């Protein structure tokens, strides 16, 4: 699956963080030529030539793994919202309030969300893998349980910037009155040039598992796991002493 830089940085359905309409041409033209180059040079099939942006697809590896690959950039993604709360030494962060809580905001779009839910709920494979582009786990600059506002988040380009959409995926994983919970789900991610592993909890800073929280010692409260793979040659976090990793673990116990 493509990253945003096959077109330009932090792309969404109708634009990007560093695309200026007119001065840099038309967004539609930029997407079309970028995807043409991608499909011509990458060893991947074009799922639908009439809709080149729509490249979500699935693979079955016997009864061992069912792999769903998601498209999160160009088909339906809502525009990223800005992070406007300054954190000394860390840059800007944001709280999940206001427009961040709008359920209409999406990474996948209604059609792809329904497709993913159906695949997860009906898969007979032992493992359900999801390959996708941006970190699903919460990544906080300040930790707090949901009952206290949830804390502050670093990156609104990730699923943190689309909390209602992420909750809809969690609802599929947890199951409901008519659908069983989805077990053995693993999310595989790229994007941020560094390696991470996380339990996936909706409320990781809440230690009370009875109220939907998460126990880092036992993993109770985790509904899936995520592995984020590093880049091949692009630089990642410069953290030779491990200070950044220690800080992040202190406010993100699910890592």
Segments the model singles out, each with a brief description of its role:
Residues 1-255:
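Long, structured stretches of catalytic cores involved in phosphate-ester chemistry, encompassing
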């Amino acid at each position: 699956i493509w990253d945003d830089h096959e077109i330009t940085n932090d792309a969404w359905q109708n634009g990007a963080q560093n695309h200026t309409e007119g001065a840099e041409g038309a967004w539609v033209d930029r997407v079309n030529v970028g995807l043409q180059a991608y499909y011509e040079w990458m060893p991947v099939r074009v799922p639908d030539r009439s809709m080149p942006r729509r490249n979500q697809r699935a693979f079955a590896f016997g009864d061992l793994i069912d792999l769903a690959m998601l498209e999160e950039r160009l088909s339906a993604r809502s525009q990223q919202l800005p992070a406007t709360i300054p954190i000394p030494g860390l840059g800007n962060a944001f709280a999940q309030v206001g427009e961040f809580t709008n359920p209409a905001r999406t990474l996948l779009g209604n059609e792809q969300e329904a497709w993913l839910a159906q695949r997860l709920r009906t898969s007979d494979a032992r493992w359900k893998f999801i390959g996708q582009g941006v970190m699903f786990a919460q990544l906080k600059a300040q930790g707090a349980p949901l009952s206290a506002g949830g804390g502050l988040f670093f990156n609104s380009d990730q699923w943190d910037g689309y909390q209602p959409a992420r909750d809809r995926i969690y609802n599929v994983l947890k199951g409901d009155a008519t659908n069983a919970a989805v077990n053995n789900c693993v999310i595989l991610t790229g994007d941020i040039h560094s390696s991470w592993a996380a339990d996936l909890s909706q409320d990781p800073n809440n230690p009370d598992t009875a109220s939907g929280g998460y126990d880092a010692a036992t993993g109770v409260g985790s509904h899936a796991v995520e592995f984020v793979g590093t880049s091949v040659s692009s630089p990642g976090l410069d953290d030779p002493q491990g200070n950044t990793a220690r800080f992040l673990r202190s406010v993100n116990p699910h890592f």
